[in-house]
């Protein structure tokens, strides 16, 4: 198994080393400034690096990584209209769901599905997670999850 390491230089010249995940979504956004504020200030993602000239940013939160780039027509496969990302649900596993939920509430950001505990069957186990859903400024559906562990499925 090989590991890809990306080295980049931020705007003040400090070197960062990033282990790249096997899948890193790149979201097209309508307004880079608005989206960057939303992801970094409200959702508490870390800005790993940016290319302001391309209106691009690489972000992380715990072990999750995403890229955002203002729509420029380069990656479009069809016409974009709100809500972007129809039919997709990004599940983002985080360490402290209450901290993030509190940030959204403090910023009076609308919650699509309120925080709740759910258990999903996976063969003979139930996997638990505390979760809530929101739409980002462009309508991408984001499901934030904190794992609660697993337990045996009870026999009927």
What are these regions (language model features)?
Residues 3-24, 46-95, 102-135, 145-156:
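Vicinal oxygen chelate
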Residues 29-31:
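Conserved beta-strand-loop-alpha-helix junction that forms the acyl-donor binding cleft
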Residues 35-40, 104, 139:
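Conserved active-site tyrosine of GNAT-family acetyltransferases
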């Amino acid at each position: 198994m090989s590991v890809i390491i990306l080295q980049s230089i931020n705007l003040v010249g400090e070197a960062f080393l990033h282990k790249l995940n096997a899948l890193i979504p790149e979201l097209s956004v309508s307004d880079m400034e608005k989206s960057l504020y939303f992801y970094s200030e409200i959702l508490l993602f870390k800005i790993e690096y940016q290319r302001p000239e391309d209106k691009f940013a690489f972000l992380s939160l715990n072990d999750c990584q995403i890229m955002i780039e203002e729509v420029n027509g380069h990656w479009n496969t069809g016409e974009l209209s709100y809500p972007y990302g129809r039919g997709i649900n990004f599940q983002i596993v985080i360490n402290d769901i209450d901290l993030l939920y509190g940030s959204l509430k403090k910023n009076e950001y609308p919650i699509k599905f309120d925080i709740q505990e759910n258990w999903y069957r996976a063969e003979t186990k139930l996997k638990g997670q505390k979760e809530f859903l929101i739409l980002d400024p462009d309508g991408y559906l984001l499901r934030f999850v904190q794992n609660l562990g697993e337990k045996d499925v009870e026999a009927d």
